[in-house]
């Protein structure tokens, strides 16, 4: 179920404050955040946000096509190592 339009997008207030500070200071350092639930706003375009995936912070460069998505969509939490190979016994 999607979020009601009358409520607007959810973004943690500390993330917006850090983004505004980075834009005014023209700071290129990644903004560290644990807020995977925050929606990407148009003000974030051009910033690099380091999103926590449970183990480390994954740097995500924000482009215009990402607006409206959640930050957690771009920092994967699980790594797929492939299915194990079949170990069939060969009779001689």
From Swiss-Prot:
GO-annotated molecular function: rRNA binding; structural constituent of ribosome
Coiled-coil spans in chain: none
Signal peptide (residue range): none
Pfam families cross-referenced by the UniProt entry: Ribosomal_S19
Source organism of this protein record: Polaromonas sp. (strain JS666 / ATCC BAA-500)
GO biological process terms, semicolon-separated: ribosomal small subunit assembly; translation
Function: Protein S19 forms a complex with S13 that binds strongly to the 16S ribosomal RNA.
Keyword field: Ribonucleoprotein, Ribosomal protein, RNA-binding, rRNA-binding
Protein name according to UniProt: Small ribosomal subunit protein uS19
Gene this chain is encoded by: rpsS
């Amino acid at each position: 179920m999607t979020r009601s339009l009358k409520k607007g997008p959810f973004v943690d207030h500390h993330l917006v404050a850090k983004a505004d500070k980075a834009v005014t200071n023209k700071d290129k350092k990644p903004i560290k955040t644990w807020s995977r639930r925050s929606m990407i706003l148009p003000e974030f375009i051009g910033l690099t946000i380091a999103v926590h995936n449970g183990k480390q912070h994954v740097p995500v460069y924000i482009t215009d096509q990402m607006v409206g998505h959640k930050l957690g969509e771009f920092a994967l939490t699980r790594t797929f190592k492939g299915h194990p190979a079949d170990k069939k016994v060969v009779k001689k």
